[in-house]
Amino acid sequence: MRSEGIIYPVLLEVRRILDRQISLFSGEDFTIDEAVGLNGVFDFLLARSSEVLEIEAPAVVIVEAKKTDLKSGLGQCIAEMVAAQRFNQVKEKNIPIIYGSVSNGIQWQFIKLENQIVTIDLSVYPLPPVEQILSFFIFMMQNDAIDSETI
């Protein structure tokens, strides 16, 4: 998918900027609770761990890649964010906010899951400029980084 070819290098750059203190996963099974539909394969996941062999909590950001229409990916991204929240709870690494993004590579839309409340940023951000998108992801990965260790 063309969008994934644009999204992946952006997320790799976030990892590089943050000194490889985060991990990036793509296309892996993320079955958390099949009974409630929290199963499937995510497009991209960023975790606040330098481990790259397996997903370790806390999972912080989910990115859903779409060919064109971003709206078509919002529901799926939110479900994956809920799965990430549950994953963190099971691993006893709760963090207050899980972030999400739906992108076709040149347009990016962002979502926040705080406790049980989902907030969708109605703005759609273009790429380029890449600096703005990078700054959003860096903020997400650093937000509450210190607090998450004590929660």
Residue ranges and their predicted role:
Residues M1-D29:
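Acidic-basic catalytic patches of nuclease active cores, encompassing PD-(D/E)XK
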Residues R2-S3, G37-F42, S72-C77:
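Phosphate/oxyanion-binding active-site loops and adjacent basic polyanion-contact surfaces
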Residues I6, F42-S50, P58-K67, E80:
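Conserved catalytic cores of phosphodiester-cleaving nucleases, focusing on short active-site segments
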Residues I22-V52:
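Active-site metal-binding core of divalent-cation-utilizing nuclease and nuclease-like domains
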Residues F30-I32, E64-L70:
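A short glycine/serine-rich beta->alpha loop
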Residues V52-A57, E92-I95:
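Short, solvent-exposed loop/turn segments that connect beta-strands within catalytic domains
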Residues T68-I120:
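Nucleic-acid nuclease catalytic cores
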Residues G105-I151:
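Intrinsically disordered, low-complexity terminal regions enriched in charged/polar residues
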